[in-house]
Amino acid sequence: MRRFALGLAFCGALLVGGCSSSGDAVDSSDVGGARTINGIVVEAGAELPGVNLSGADLSGAYLVGINLAGADLTGANLSGADLSGANFLDANLYQANLSGANLNIAYLHRADLVDANMSGADLTGADLSGTFLLNTNLRDANLTGADLSRSNRTTADFTGATMPDGTKHP
């Protein structure tokens, strides 16, 4: 069994959890069909608006339809995670690692993705309107049908990405 130490930022943030005020290590396992991420039970579709998950390792997590509106995910590792249909409205994903993540039809309106790594991410049909994509790595990402209107993407790297209209960026 993997063990993770939890910081106080996670305490009380989720519907079911295993944190203590001392930050003791918590086991990772499956509980009643839910997924355990960093020792905290999180189900797909969980409501976690405004939660502080900065620096969290959520790589490979199954978090379909999760609500992380206004959440702080600064420097979080979400690589390879299934975040399809997730809500990241106004979320802070500064320097987050979303490489290879599934973000199909995710709602990222006004999210801060400055310096984020989204290489190889699947953003098919995602709403990225009004996002901050400064220095964001979107190499080889799939943006087919995505909404990039009003996004600040002047320094984003789209090398090899499939653009919203289905064309390949050079």
Predicted regions and their residues:
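C-terminal motif of bacterial Sec signal peptides marking the signal peptidase cleavage site
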Residues: 15-18
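Bacterial N-terminal signal peptides that target proteins for export
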Residues: 1-8
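Tandem repeat scaffolds
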Residues: 21-170
